[in-house]
Amino acid sequence: MPSSPPPDGGNANKTSIKPVSLSLGSSKKLPIKKPVSSHTLARRPHHNLPYHHDSDSDDNGGDSEPAFQSVTGFDTLTGRTLDASGAEEKKPLTIPVASGNNWRDRPGVIRRSKGKNLLPKEVQALQEAQSKGEVPGDGDAVGPSMQYGLSFAKQPQNDGGDQKMEDAALPAVEAAEKAKPLTEDEIALQALVRESRGEVEGRSDLVIESTRAGEGEAEEDVNEFYDGHNSETRSFRADVAARPESATLEQYNTIPVEEFGAALLRGMGWKEGQAVGKGKYGSADPSRASTPHIPARRPGFLGIGAKDVSNGKAEVELGAWGKAAMRKGSKKAGEATKNGEGNTEGIYMPVLMRNKKTGEMITEEELAAMAKEAKKRDDSEDWKEERDRNSERSERDKDHHRDRDRDRDSRRLEYDDTYRYESRRNGSSRRDRSRSTSDRHSRRRKYEGDDGDRRDDRYYRDRDRERRSDPVRDRDRNRDRKSRYYDDDRNSSWYSSSTASSKQRNRDRDRDRDNDRDSRRRK
């Protein structure tokens, strides 16, 4: 007995439960929809499947069958489906960056030990897949197998019977054959055999076993091996050996030029829709991660490193330069001021300079004014120095004239002294001659009587008195002459001083000669 036809698709969608009808014929069974419980998990949407077509809509009443897909398994780490046909969906081109291409990982570089990664293996594998650009779509990833919350250990089920014990397999002990040391006869015999075969070089039987880092060995031990004494050559060879192989021409041809940059960024962890720059790929803030970095425009007429003190008001047009652009900007600024708007386009902003000694900030105009004042000050200082030099020159001229007059006076005095000395010496010679004559007369009158003797005694007394007074006068005269000569020698030139000294020596020599002659006569 056929059942009544079901209601329309639209009404069926509105109702939660359809009426059940039975049929005894071979008619096709209609699917029965069960009410959705809030305790059950939502099904994975079909649009995540690779063979699902978005063109399929629900206009057919929801009776359209999904696309056929044969799945052989699931990846427990990344949550990807393994297709039986082996066909893979087209993935965006990605150029992975070699993780070993880091200078910190090179031999000879001191590396710090990394902390232990406490994340589950599933999360670590998911992060590694994301770094390689193999992240599945939304909803495809399977969560980690770790259970959160309160968990109980599973109790073994024991029915109370005897448990079957299996015999443990005994490890196979292999007898290691120990190599016996060769005797001297055997060594000599092997040497003869090698010589007969033409093998001149002998072979050593020694074996040095190398220890390799096992899987359970700590990473610090491996780092200690690399952190040993490594020369530059060893480090260079290790770096060259760690380099990947060069790409072939076919590999270059398979990568389109317009997709190379995006593929390289994907290999570095970049995703579609993210902003490029400033390293904000993994930012937790989505707005910050998707906001592109726009470089700030440099204010007008400012060089590299200069700071803008106008708060961004010194903007000029591209290509504007010179006084014409400044006048144009000033006109615009005047019009804007009249209209009530603060347009300062094209206004020249002076570059401030800092004085290293005082720390004062000055402009170019102030620096030029300071340089002009410094020049005037230098000119005035030069005039003062010139005046001082002129005064010193005049003083030197006066001293020169004074010395010349003094030399002339000294020469005149020397001439007078020489004249007096010569006249005195001539007078003394005449006196000596007269004395010698009187001596002869006295000797002649010696025999003449007592009157002659008295006259001779008076003459001798007068002569002795004169002699006693002459040395005192000579000493005073010599002292005055020496002091005068000393002053002349100190203030006069070298020639005048040498001349005076020579004359003085001559006078002293003459005086000594006269004294010697007088002394001889006195005897």
Curated annotation (Swiss-Prot):
Keywords: mRNA processing, mRNA splicing, Nucleus, Spliceosome. SMART domains: G_patch (SM00443). Residues 41-50 have a biased composition (Basic residues). InterPro entries: G_patch_dom, Spp2-like, Spp2/MOS2_G-patch. Residues 492-502 have a biased composition (Low complexity). The lineage of its organism: Eukaryota, Fungi, Dikarya, Ascomycota, Pezizomycotina. Belongs to the SPP2 family. Residues 12-26, 67-79 have a biased composition (Polar residues). Residues 372-440, 447-491, 505-523 have a biased composition (Basic and acidic residues). Associated with the spliceosome. Its main location: nucleus. GO terms for biological process: mRNA splicing, via spliceosome. Involved in spliceosome maturation and the first step of pre-mRNA splicing. Residues 1-165, 200-230, 275-300, 323-347, 359-523 are annotated as: Disordered. This is Pre-mRNA-splicing factor spp2. One of its GO terms (cellular component) is spliceosomal complex. It is found in: Nucleus. Residues 257-309 form the G-patch domain. GO terms for molecular function: nucleic acid binding. Pfam families: G-patch_2. It comes from the Eukaryota. The gene is spp2.
